[in-house]
Every structure is written in C-alpha cells, then in structure tokens.
C-alpha cells in the first residue's frame, strides 16, 4: 500500500506531520481523526471531541494496542470544508462532521440537515436500522465514506439583537442556517443567508456579518456565542433543526483493514451512539443555563411554532431537494416514512 507524498498532502491542505500511515493490525494501524471543534480531554470539553477520544481509547484497548488514533481538533489537520472530500480520496482517515457540509458536492447529503424532517432524537437515531439509514449508508459507501457512529444533534439560534423564534422573526436578518436546505427556508421567510462552518461563527457575529446563527446546542457554547448574543432560542423542548453529524471513516482505509479491525471499529462506533445521544440532550439543556448566566434572554419553541417552520420547509426545501434527482426524491420519501 502506498503512502501519499508530502506534495500530495500539502495540496490537500493536510498538515505535514499528519501524513497517513496504514498497516495491518500486526504491524500497527495509526488513525488520524479530524474535526472542527475545540479540543479537550476524554472527560471534559465539547462532547464530539470527547467521543472521538473515547473511540480512540476503546479501539486501542480492544486491539491490544494494534490500533491507535490521534485526534486533531479545531481543524488543525485540515480545513473544515476539506475533510469530507479528503476522506473520499483516502487522504484522511476519519472525521466527525455535519454530513450536510458535503451537500454542495453530493446533493443527497443535504437530507442530514433538512428542517422539519427530524424533530426528535428517537426518530433520527431510528434511521440507522430503517430503509432510510440503510440506503443513506449505501450511498455514502458508494462515494467512499463509511458511517461508524450515528450522531444527531438538536439545534437552536443565537442572535445579536432580536430573537429568532417565529417564522416572521427572520425577515430582514442576516442568518447562518447551517445547510443549503435551511437557507432556502430562511430566504423564503425574508432573511439574507450566509454559509460558513460553525467554527467561523464567532468572527461573523462579532463583525456584524451575521445577525443570528442556527447551530447545534453544543456549538452554541463551544464557540462561545453567548459572549455576543442577546437572545437564544433553544432546542431543549422542541426543534425543527436536527443535524446528522456522524463519525465517518474513509472507505479506502476501511477496506484495507483486517476483518478483526473492522469488527472492533464498528462495534465501538455503535457502543458510542448512546453516549452521543445523552451528551447532545444534556447540551440542549445546558446551553440555556450558559446563555442565561451571560445575560441573554432564552426562548423555547412549542409544537405550533415548529409546525409553522415545518410547513414552510415542506413548500421550499423539501420540494427543492426532491426535485434534485430521483435518488433525492427516493431518500426523502424514505425519511418521511420515519415520522415526518
């Protein structure tokens, strides 16, 4: 198996020390896991970083040291928006990333942040063992990526001047929606939209380029938006914004692993799904306390408000997505069968 050259690595935006090392379990397999979130420890910090660290510890333990993994937080290995395509090429081993970030290249993946489609954790995590999850996993595999851990997160909105709760509140605001489909809904509601990863939100809000940001409950605190926001709309009660943000692996690497290594990786990945769910739910509650302590006014959504957002999404984002291709229409139909 060849190792990519330093020139190739630099062309892909990979830090020089992160040249990939593959090998059999006997020789030792060292994985590189990249993500955009702040780094911490296995016990403290952003739960997505903690989940990656737990994954690394568990595969090392189960393989008796034959497999190891190094975590690169804060997009320190490569830029956020380069990570998915790098996995497809075999130039990055693993990433924990919002799947909709790849929706520009693979329209099907915008399903991972389709407003109003998933409105609860049980529904979202239920995708894995239903036709929608099986078909989505099959599609990803055909594009060179394997889902290791299914993670869903509810989200909310942090805003600088006025709250973003009702559909009508969006009019005239500059809002980061988090996906192309969410942007379509916001534009229909009268907002201007901007597209950027969550680790760039602080600067955008600080400069006034962004009035409000929709992002996961965890990112609302990890990126310290409470320092800038006067209002928070939470996802702790109800939400129309649920994001699929799995731990992924390059299929090029996965296919080179031994059967034993694959079994360890998949079993550990599955075991961590309940941890991801409970941590996400905890953050849905914790974010409100953090923003209240910072002096922001906190708002919650009720079913009537969520339904209005969902109705707008059905007429805009859902239709747009279904019209992209027969495959998009098929995936949306399967997702709707889970309870949307």
Language-model regions: role of each:
Residues 2-5, 10-20, 26-123, 132, ...:
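N-terminal secretory/targeting leader peptides
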């Amino acid at each position: 198996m060849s190792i990519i050259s330093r020139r190739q690595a630099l062309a892909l935006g990979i830090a020089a020390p992160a040249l990939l090392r593959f090998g059999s379990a006997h020789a030792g397999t060292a994985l590189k896991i990249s993500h955009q979130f702040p780094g911490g420890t296995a016990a403290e910090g952003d739960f997505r970083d903690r989940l990656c660290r737990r994954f690394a510890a568990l595969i090392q333990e189960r393989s008796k040291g034959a497999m190891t993994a190094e975590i690169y937080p804060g997009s320190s290995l490569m830029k956020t928006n380069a990570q998915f395509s790098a996995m497809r090429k075999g130039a990055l081993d693993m990433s924990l990333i919002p799947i909709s970030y790849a929706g520009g290249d693979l329209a099907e993946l915008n399903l991972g942040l389709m407003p109003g489609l998933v409105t609860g954790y049980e529904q979202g995590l239920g995708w894995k063992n239903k036709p929608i999850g099986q078909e989505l996993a099959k599609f990803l595999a055909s594009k060179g990526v394997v889902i290791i851990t299914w993670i869903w997160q509810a989200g909310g909105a942090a805003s600088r001047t006025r709250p973003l709760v009702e559909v009508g509140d969006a009019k005239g605001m500059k809002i980061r929606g988090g996906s192309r489909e969410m942007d379509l809904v916001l534009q229909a509601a009268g907002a201007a939209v901007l597209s950027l990863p969550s680790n760039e939100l602080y600067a955008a809000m600080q400069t006034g380029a962004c009035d409000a940001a929709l992002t996961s409950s965890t990112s609302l605190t990890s990126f310290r938006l409470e320092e800038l926001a006067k209002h928070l709309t939470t996802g702790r009660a109800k939400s129309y914004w649920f994001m699929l943000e799995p731990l992924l692996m390059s299929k090029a690497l996965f296919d080179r692993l031994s059967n034993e290594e694959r079994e360890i990786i998949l079993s550990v990945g599955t075991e961590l799904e309940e941890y991801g769910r409970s941590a996400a739910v905890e953050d849905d509650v914790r974010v409100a306390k953090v923003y209240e302590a910072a002096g922001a006014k906190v708002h919650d959504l009720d079913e009537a408000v969520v339904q209005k957002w969902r109705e707008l999404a059905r007429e805009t984002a859902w239709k747009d997505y279904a019209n992209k291709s027969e495959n998009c229409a098929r995936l949306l139909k399967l997702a709707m069968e889970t309870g949307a």
